[in-house]
Amino acid sequence: MSRPLVALSLGLVLFRVLSAALFVTQPGFTDAYYYVDVAARLAHGQGLTADFIWNFLEAPRLDPLPVPSHRFWMPLATVVQATGIAALEPVLGVFRSAQAAIIAVAAFVPAAAYVSARSLGASSRAALAAAALAGLGGFTFAPAWVTLDSFAIAALVGTMFFVVFSRAAFGDVRAGAIAGALVGLLFLARAEGALFGLALVALAFRRSSRAAGIAGSAIALAIGLAWLARGLALPGPAAIALAKGVFIVRYEDFFALNPNGSADLATLIGVRAGALWSDLVVALAALLLFLAVPLVLGLRAGWRFPAVRAFAALALLIYVAEALIWPLHATRGSYFHSLAAFYPFAMALVALGGETWLARLEQNARRLATAGTLGAVAILAVFGLTNWDASFNVPYRARVAALEAIPPGPFLAIDAAAWRWISDRSVLLVPSDGPETAACVAIAYRAQSLVLEPAHFSAYQSLYDGNGSPWFVQRAESGAIRIYSLVRNPGCPSPDQIIR
């Protein structure tokens, strides 16, 4: 590794530490809360289990706590964070030790982008620019690299897949096996990572790379099947995660005990068309718009490389799959998450395309253009961090302020993973079915309180507006957060009768 790359990587690590210290001071959003909640239990020897219910697909029959975790989300982010907690909790505490593990992974993202750019024929200067672009992350990924999520993990694993894939495409069996292991790891970080395995399957159909493709596909398949077998072994219907992930037509139904939404063909098509447009905007935003042109130039310049063709094919495949198969999830963060696996390699292509285009200019003009681009990305990164602060730290402080108004014991809330972290108590999801079902959930788990925030399911609007409910009465208010007490049993049947 060259000295300039080492110096740049260390500088970017410092930038991440400052980002974490000043802005990303708590998990922030549901995914991250979930990962670290379970990571703490895993680090303390309690396995992949949760003592809260963020979604009823993890407690399909209102199963007693703790329940097996990760029926929907993938486990690698939790495992990485648990490693940090096990090693550093006595010194840094749970949150900072989990975050330290993520920052350690993110520290290698610039180097991965550098190696990618060099593998495509870019000069060392252009490769350093790619490393800086990937490391800074711009408006979208600057905070993502230090959040307790899968962004940094997917970025590193996905980028190394493209680097190794080129060698596998020329018949290197060892490279094919490594690529397969990377696909397996990417799948354990993000479910759509399994689609990367199709690139290895394609190699198996070519005589020159057949052995490499078969080796990689077999390893990726073995890892994937092992995780799927774990899911099948858990109690409850295994198809529930698929049904809630793919077949819902209203996003609220994802959080219902009994999803009952229906839609005609026009609505189904409209939702997917909307997701295609929304995801395109997200992709352009992740590229900071002005990097889209050098990316296209980089694709043209590097098209002769198998990794570049695989990058283009997989990027298009995942864009279409997210919008058509998981449209409701794609437009609520899933597609943005999937872009992390592509981002550093995309920055390598941006550097390659930029170098190709700037070659026609004088040296001073090239330096000015490069410095201007990096400066703009750095400024946008700072804006991204301040936006993260406003988007996630402000609601966090409101929840902390409301905590003392919530009576002791378990309670119901719309973001159970977040409230579990904040309250250090068992928290159950407020079912989107409505207050009557919520009362039954509360009784099943011996909870006496329900918390409603400004963002709540439509079935609770009347209760939130103060119109009352036969089962809950308001007992306290903290800002826009309202706390209700359970006052009546609606005559709940058994869980098997509640859940159809």
Q: PLM ranges: what are they?
A:
Residues 369-420, 426, 431-444, 453-454, ...:
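Membrane-embedded, lumen/periplasm-facing catalytic core of multi-pass transferases
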Residues 201-205, 274-319, 350-356:
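Hydrophobic, aromatic-rich transmembrane alpha-helices
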Residues 15-19, 210-294, 318:
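Membrane-lumen/periplasm interface segments of specific transmembrane helices
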Residues 167-172, 195-221, 228, 300-301:
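Perimembrane helix-loop-helix junctions
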Residues 130-135, 159-164, 175-190, 197-204, ...:
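Membrane-interface alpha helices of multi-pass inner-membrane proteins
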Residues 151, 157, 309-310, 330-361:
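Hydrophobic/aromatic-rich transmembrane helices and adjacent perimembrane loops
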Residues 97-121, 159-163:
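Transmembrane-helix motifs of polytopic, lipid-linked glycan transferases
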Residues 6-9, 125-129, 181, 198, ...:
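Signature aromatic-anchored transmembrane alpha helix within multi-pass, membrane-resident enzymes
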